[in-house]
């Protein structure tokens, strides 16, 4: 199914979550650009290329939401302790997992898939002996704010980030979720 196709059917009971396969990374990169690009998200081509090189090398990991064999959601996260220095002032313990991307197909938005992906990472983190998860978003991105709130993330703070944010307040909000 083409990535850009609008999906109007309700989520089926066949929805499942699985690790990304190396042989689908090219497709998932296109999916991320096509479904994740909007005024709030920072998706520089060179940064995403580097992100997918890390995925191919097994440095980072990705989880895919699949409906009837079609990827409809994606979350990318790093290894414990691998947190961008930009966020270090907001965390006390570096034994955390940084979630770099969460994207849901536009035809599936508002159905809880992003929250479900985050909850799956929270479940995995509990088995990895980490203290928390860290994620960021544009301060004014209400859809991301709600998704993260539903998954139990709380804001640690916001900072002016004109290098990555070109609209609205130009602030990034850093959030965390303690691992149970």
What are these regions (language model features)?
Residues 135-145:
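Conserved beta-strand-loop-alpha-helix junction that forms the acyl-donor binding cleft
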Residues 12-30:
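A short beta-loop-alpha structural element at the N-terminal edge
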Residues 40-67, 76:
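Active-site rim helix/loop that mediates acceptor-substrate recognition in acyltransferases
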Residues 104, 110-123, 146-150:
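Conserved acetyl-CoA-binding loop-helix of GNAT-fold acetyltransferases
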Residues 136, 149-169:
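Conserved catalytic-core motifs of GNAT/GCN5-like acyltransferases
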Residues 74-101, 162-166:
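Conserved acyl-donor/pantetheine-binding loop and adjacent beta-alpha core of acyl/acetyltransferases
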Residues 125-137:
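Conserved GNAT acetyl-CoA-binding A-motif
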Residues 93-94, 100-109, 137-138:
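A short, internal acetyl-CoA/4′-phosphopantetheine-binding micro-motif in the GNAT/acyltransferase core
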